[in-house]
Amino acid sequence: LVIQGEYSLLDTFNVFQGEPTVVFSSKQSPNTEHVSYETLSSDLSMPNQVCNYLYDRQIQSLIVEGGAQVLQQFISEGLWDEARIFVGKSQFSEGIKAPLLHEPWESVHNVEGDYLFIYKNPIQG
C-alpha cells in the first residue's frame, strides 16, 4: 500500500515494479496491470479509509513506514497496536520531528549501541 500525497509518485519507483500495489490518493487515476488506485474521500480520515480497505479484504496486519505526518495520523486516531522506535547516538538540530507517543515504553533493548523502545497501545489491550 502506498499513500500518495499531493504530488504523483514516479512509476519508476521499485514499489511499482511487478508486485500488486494499491495507491491511496486524493486524485483519481486509472488502474494499471499491477497498480490499483483508491481515491481518498474527504468524509473519512485517511487512516480509517486504509483500515476499512484492509478489513474488507480480510487483511489483519499493517506495518506503517512513512513520514512523520502519516505516522502521527495513525497514532492520533488510536489505530496502532505496537510501535518500535530506534534511538541512536546522533542528534539532529534540524529536520522533521518524529511523531509523539504519550504512553510509557513497555521494553527497551540495546541493539549494537542503539536503543530500541517498544510501545504498546493501552487502548488495544
Residue ranges of model-derived segments:
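Conserved histidine-centered catalytic loops in small-molecule metabolism enzymes
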Residues: G95-G125
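Small/polar glycine-rich anion-binding or flexible loop at a beta-alpha turn
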Residues: G66-Q73, K89-F92
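Active-site ligand-binding patch in enzyme domains
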Residues: L1-Q60, Q69-Q72, G125
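Short acidic amphipathic segments
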Residues: F74-E82
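Helical hairpin unit composed of two closely spaced alpha helices linked by a short loop
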Residues: I59-L62, G66, R84-F86
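Well-ordered beta-strand positions
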Residues: V22, E82-R84
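Extended hydrophobic-aromatic, low-complexity segments
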Residues: L62, E94-G95
